[in-house]
């Protein structure tokens, strides 16, 4: 019994250390290296500003369309602009914590405390806008449970979080950061494809 205990104790310690390293909300699988994923995640998480331009495709119940995407992020301020999807014309979502506004061409300007409530009320989409801040960088949102699959390069390949499935189909390096260039999101009767043509990452807090 003593020999068995001596053999099992270090194994159990290693298992617990590995689970703690991943964080309480994160389950990781896939061919990548967990330590390399943690290093990549920590590096990309230092980005608190960016400018993105590209294309977006949206499939919703009984409607679909595509358009262009522009996203300016400056720490806790965001300015997300869509033009063309679903025949709505230009749509602009801007704000900071607890103060968000949505402008829809031909309909006016609307305000709410959260981007999720505003988008659902005015566009009818249950879209986790706050999670997109993380997902667009190839990271899980830290405030809820997630199941991750990392690829052979130890980058996020697939994410399941809060009823959404996110697939990362292409990456590229920009200013020393490996960032997603093609993302497919599916959940709550929505399917969204993002194709990022231009990434300009920034570390504003440093």
UniProtKB/Swiss-Prot annotation:
Subcellular location: Cell outer membrane
Keyword Plastid part of the UniProt annotation: no
Alphabetical list of SUPFAM superfamilies matching this protein: Prokaryotic lipoproteins and lipoprotein localization factors
Signal sequence bounds: 1-18
GO biological process, one term: lipoprotein localization to outer membrane
Lipid anchor positions (S-diacylglycerol cysteine): 19
Lipid modification (N-palmitoyl cysteine), residues: 19
Family matches, as Gene3D superfamilies: Lipoprotein localisation LolA/LolB/LppX
GO annotation, cellular component aspect: cell outer membrane
UniProt keyword terms in alphabetical order: Cell outer membrane, Chaperone, Lipoprotein, Membrane, Palmitate, Protein transport, Signal, Transport
Pfam families: LolB
HAMAP family: LolB
Its job: Plays a critical role in the incorporation of lipoproteins in the outer membrane after they are released by the LolA protein.
Similarity remark: Belongs to the LolB family.
Name of the featured protein: Outer-membrane lipoprotein LolB
